[in-house]
From Swiss-Prot:
It is a multi-pass membrane protein. Pfam families: GIDE (PF12483), zf-C3HC4_3 (PF13920). Its main location: mitochondrion. The gene is MUL1. This is Mitochondrial ubiquitin ligase activator of NFKB 1.
Length: 352
C-alpha cells in the first residue's frame, strides 16, 4: 500500500488483469455452456424409410437442430489418396507443417515451434446412408467444411528431416532458428465411414439435406457417436467453468486483500489521531496545572516519558517528540510515536 492507504500500481494491475481474465473466461464458459445445452436438446432422427414422412410433418419441413447418423457414400466420383493404395474418400486434406527450434532470449532455451506452410482441402459431394442394406434413403451433406468437428482420419504421415551442413548449423545458431524438418500429412473422410451429423435437416423437392444450422448453433460432422460428442462438449464446459472459478477466486482474493489493507490503514490512522489528541489533551492538562515558570519546560518534554526534554528530530516525518532514551527503547523497526512512519534517520536536537 502507498501512503494514505491507496492501492499500489502493482495491485491495480493485478486486480485489473484478474478481472479481465475472469470476464473473458466466464464469457467463453457461457458460450460453451450454451452450445452444450443446445447440443443436448438436439432432436435425434433415425435414418430410415420414415425420414421423409417425419420431415414432411415437421413445421416448414425442417428440423432446426437434428442429430443423424449414417455411413458416408459418394454421390458420383471419389477422391483417391495420393499415398495409400485403394483408399477412397469424399474429403481429402493435405498439410505441410514446418517444425523448428527457436531461441528464447528471455529463458535462454530452445523452444519447439511449428507452423503450417501449406494446406489444401479437396471435397466431392457425398450423402449419409443407412448401414442396413435395402433402405432407399439418403441425406445430402452440404458445406462440410463449415463443420467445427470434421471427422477426418490421418491415412499418411511422414517427417522429412532437414539436411544441414556445418555452415548452416552456424548460421542457424546465429539467427536463433534451427529447422528440424517438414511433416507431411494426408487426412481423409473415407467412403463407408460412420459419421454423426448435427445440423439443420431439411426436406426440399423430395430430397433430404443436412446443412449448417441457423441462430448461431454449431455444425458437427463427427466420427464419434452422439453420446461421446456430447460428453466431450460437457467436459470442455467443466474445464472452462473451473478456470473461470479459479480466476474469479483470485480476483475476489485480490479485492479482499486491497480492501482489508485499506481498512487496517484507516483504523491505524484513527488510532494515531486518537493518540495525538490524548497527548495534546494530557499536555494541556499538565500545562494548566503547572506553575507559570514550569510551563516552558513542559512544552519541551518528551511525549513518551514526559520527564526528559525532547532531544531527537525524526526523519523523514520531521517530528520532534522524544528524548534519546525513549528513542533507544522504541521496538524495531523504529517508528515515530506521533505518525507511525518509519524512522530512517535521527538528528540530535540541542536545547540552549
Amino acid at each position: 500500500m502507498e501512503n494514505g492507504g491507496r492501492p499500489s500500481l502493482c495491485q491495480f494491475i493485478l486486480l485489473g488483469t484478474t478481472s479481465v481474465v475472469t470476464a473473458a473466461l466466464y464469457s467463453v464458459y457461457r458460450q460453451k455452456a450454451w452450445v452444450s445445452q443446445e447440443l443436448k436438446g438436439a432432436k435425434k432422427v433415425h435414418l430410415g424409410e420414415d425420414l421423409k414422412s417425419i420431415l414432411s410433418e415437421a413445421p416448414g419441413k425442417c428440423v432446426p437442430y437434428a442429430v443423424i447418423e449414417g455411413a458416408v457414400r459418394s454421390v458420383k466420383e471419389t477422391l483417391n489418396s495420393q499415398f495409400v493404395e485403394n483408399c477412397k474418400g469424399v474429403i481429402q486434406r493435405l498439410t505441410l507443417q514446418e517444425h523448428k527450434m527457436v531461441w528464447n532470449r528471455t529463458t535462454h532455451l530452445w523452444n519447439d515451434c511449428s507452423k503450417i506452410i501449406h494446406q489444401r482441402t479437396n471435397t466431392v459431394p457425398f450423402d449419409l446412408v443407412p448401414h442396413e442394406d435395402g433402405v432407399d434413403v439418403a441425406v445430402r451433406v452440404l458445406k462440410p467444411l463449415d463443420s467445427v468437428d470434421l471427422g477426418l482420419e490421418a491415412v499418411y504421415e511422414k517427417f522429412h528431416p532437414s539436411i544441414q551442413s556445418f555452415t548452416d548449423v552456424i548460421g542457424h545458431y546465429i539467427s536463433g532458428e534451427r529447422p528440424k524438418g517438414i511433416q507431411e500429412t494426408e487426412e481423409m473422410l473415407k467412403v463407408g465411414a460412420t459419421l454423426t451429423g448435427v445440423g439443420e435437416l431439411v426436406l426440399d423437392n423430395n430430397s433430404v439435406r443436412l446443412q449448417p444450422p441457423k441462430q448461431g448453433m454449431q455444425y458437427y460432422l463427427s466420427s464419434q457417436d452422439f453420446d461421446s460428442l456430447l460428453q466431450r462438449q460437457e467436459s470442455s464446459v467443466r474445464l472452462w467453468k473451473v478456470l473461470a472459478l479459479v480466476f474469479g477466486f483470485a480476483t475476489c482474493a485480490t479485492l479482499f486483500f486491497i480492501l482489508r489493507k485499506q481498512y487496517l490503514q484507516r483504523q491505524e490512522r484513527l488510532r494515531l489521531k486518537q493518540m495525538q489528541e490524548e497527548f495534546q489533551e494530557h499536555e494541556a492538562q499538565l500545562l494548566s496545572r503547572a506553575k507559570p515558570e514550569d510551563r516552558e519546560s513542559l512544552k519541551s518534554a518528551c511525549v513518551v516519558c514526559l520527564s526528559s526534554f525532547k532531544s531527537c528530530v525524526f526523519l523523514e516525518c520531521g517530528h520532534v517528540c522524544s528524548c534519546t532514551e525513549c528513542y533507544r527503547a522504541l521496538p524495531e523497526p523504529k517508528k515515530c510515536p506521533i505518525c507511525r512512519q518509519a524512522i530512517t534517520r535521527v538528528i540530535p536536537l540541542y536545547n540552549s
